């Protein structure tokens, strides 16, 4: 009886917390953001690049998904947390094109989707403060297969404001 209650509790929590889930080809439920995204990426013809091309990259993709869940997704309603996360991401992307390796990965796609509402609300001046993450965001959004239904956000090509020293 305890097992049934635990299973029922699990499914209630999944529903309440809106945890992503899907049904695998074999009929099994796949639950959790990383699990669902990894499963779908495995089905892709581009799975090696999406999940990482070596063990270090695969671990890094997983770390970024955890960071996304712990930091990025939790700061949407808090201006100070949003600034902190954008500063961290901006510093990280200073000398990188993508979050992991030299090509687009699941980390880039998920972070893009998570940051889209934030970037949609930023002014040009705010976008310029986070120039490296803005450059990365603009690169990712121009892949229409990733952007899909989301609106294309406008980024200025020139500095419009004087940087504060």
Q: Where does each model-flagged region fall?
A:
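GST-like domain detector, emphasizing the conserved glutathione-binding G-site
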Residues: 1-99, 103, 116-121, 165
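Poly-acidic low-complexity segments
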Residues: 14-15, 90, 131, 138, ...
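Short acidic/histidine-centered micro-motifs embedded in hydrophobic/aromatic stretches
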Residues: 39, 64-67, 112, 136, ...
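Residue-level signal for alpha-helical context at structural boundaries
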Residues: 54, 79, 107, 127-128, ...
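Short, mixed-charge aromatic SLiMs
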Residues: 59-70, 133-147
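Short alpha-helical linear motifs
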Residues: 84-86, 131, 154-160
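GST superfamily/GST-like fold recognition
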Residues: 99-122, 127-140
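C-terminal helix/juxtamembrane-tail motif
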Residues: 145-165
């Amino acid at each position: 009886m305890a097992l049934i209650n635990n299973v029922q509790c699990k499914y209630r929590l999944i529903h309440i917390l809106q945890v992503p889930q899907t049904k695998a080809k074999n009929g099994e439920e796949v639950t959790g953001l990383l699990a669902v995204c990894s499963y779908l990426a495995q089905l892709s013809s581009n799975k090696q690049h999406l999940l990482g091309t070596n063990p270090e990259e695969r671990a890094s993709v997983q770390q970024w998904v955890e960071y996304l869940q712990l930091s990025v997704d939790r700061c949407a309603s808090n201006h100070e947390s949003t600034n902190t996360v954008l500063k961290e991401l901006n510093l990280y992307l200073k000398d990188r094109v993508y979050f992991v390796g030299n090509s687009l990965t699941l980390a880039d796609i998920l972070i893009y989707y998570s940051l889209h509402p934030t970037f949609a609300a930023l002014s040009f001046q705010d976008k310029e403060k986070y120039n490296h993450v803005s450059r990365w965001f603009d690169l990712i959004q121009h892949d229409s297969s990733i952007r899909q239904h989301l609106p294309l956000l406008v980024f200025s090509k020139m500095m419009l404001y004087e940087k504060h020293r």
